[in-house]
Amino acid sequence: MIKRSEVWTVRYPRSGAEFGRALAFFDSGAVVALTLLAINVLNRPRHDYRPETWHQDFEGLLLLRNPAMVALIISFVFVGMFWLGHHLMVAHLVAIDRSFILANLVYLFFVTLAPVAAIAMAEHSKDPYAIGFYGAWLIALTVMQCVLAWLAGRRALFAPSVNGPTYVR
């Protein structure tokens, strides 16, 4: 039986199934966000497409005349960069604990806001609130990624070579 004070410190080693399940969940959150970004590229209902004008819509996408396509590309790059940073950080972990999993859930919440931020920028690109929301979304992702790295270092979840003396403390 785990004591109440030890609930957040239960460690799951890298070789265990819990570590693999958590990693798969973290990666799938980014995949869902990227998929939802792509779904929102054309924000018109399917019944609005006419065979005689479809090529113009497609040409608009390819020439980046559709603000949703531009928002998709920019947001895709940002989500991809955050996923890569998270992936590289997790590659150096020897274990995870419940506090790290909880912090990752908060991080995934902000990752899955990517389609909302992209739609806000695509549909209201001149609105300062939309721009502010997009900036706040990026700041929240950055802060959460820093929190994850800090938490992993604080809980000694990194491999010994990463936890050892470094030039940054």
Map each language-model feature to its residues.
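Multi-pass alpha-helical transmembrane bundle typical of ion/small-solute transporters
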Residues: 1-169
